[in-house]
Regions:
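Short, conserved catalytic-motif segment at the N-terminal edge
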Residues: 1-57, 77-82, 125, 129-130
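Alpha-helix N-cap and coil->helix boundary residues
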Residues: 21, 79-83, 96-97, 118-122, ...
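N-terminal core-entry segment
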Residues: 26-37, 99, 105-109, 117, ...
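Alpha-helical scaffold elements that line and support the substrate/ligand-binding pocket
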Residues: 30-31, 56-78, 101, 143-151
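Short active-site-adjacent helix-start/loop capping segments
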Residues: 34, 44, 65-67, 95, ...
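Catalytic-site signature segments of enzymes, centered on catalytic residues
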Residues: 53, 110-151
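Active-site helix/loop module of the DD-peptidase/beta-lactamase fold
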Residues: 56-60, 72-113, 129
Length: 151
């Protein structure tokens, strides 16, 4: 593992791309082998960024959720080209594939009903009760609040 290249890329992100604040931690076989933190928590440069700075994770979980879904599909003899409704019978878009779901094309980017994101069953019920916001093939829309529930 070339940790010097990681350090260089980290510094370059600040010097050449205007990074405000960032940190990275790399672990190998249960041992932290790199811990970098630099920058500021806000543009006013009041609080320095450190390795304990708490930040929203947002879309970083999408890759992990997608990888998990793809592994589950493979383990169960399914393909990304299979229909979501094969495993989620109440899925509101009966012609959507897992590939379309994972690439934000299934038209369920927002919830029609007001639902608490802390109530999983309520959100799933809201998703199942709504119609797609567009026809498959006609659009694409980032699914920031529904993606995790869809997966």
């Amino acid at each position: 593992m070339d940790l010097e290249a990681v350090k260089l890329a980290f510094r370059k992100n600040f010097a050449e791309h205007g990074e405000l604040g960032a940190s990275v931690s790399i672990w190998k076989e249960g041992v932290e082998v790199l811990n970098l933190a630099d920058g500021w928590c806000e543009r006013d440069e009041v609080r320095p960024w450190n390795s304990a700075t708490i930040v929203p994770f947002y879309s970083a979980t999408k890759a992990l959720a997608s990888a998990t879904l793809l592994m589950l599909l493979e383990e169960n003899g399914l393909s990304p080209d299979d229909l979501v409704c094969r495993v989620w019978t109440n899925f509101p878009n009966s012609s959507a594939t897992f590939s379309e779901l994972l690439s934000h094309q299934c038209g369920l980017a927002a919830l029609d009903q007001k639902s608490s994101v802390f109530d999983h069953e309520e959100v799933i019920s809201a998703i199942e009760a709504q119609e797609s916001n567009w026809e498959l093939g006609d659009g694409h829309g980032y699914h920031p609040r529904t993606f995790g529930f869809l997966v």
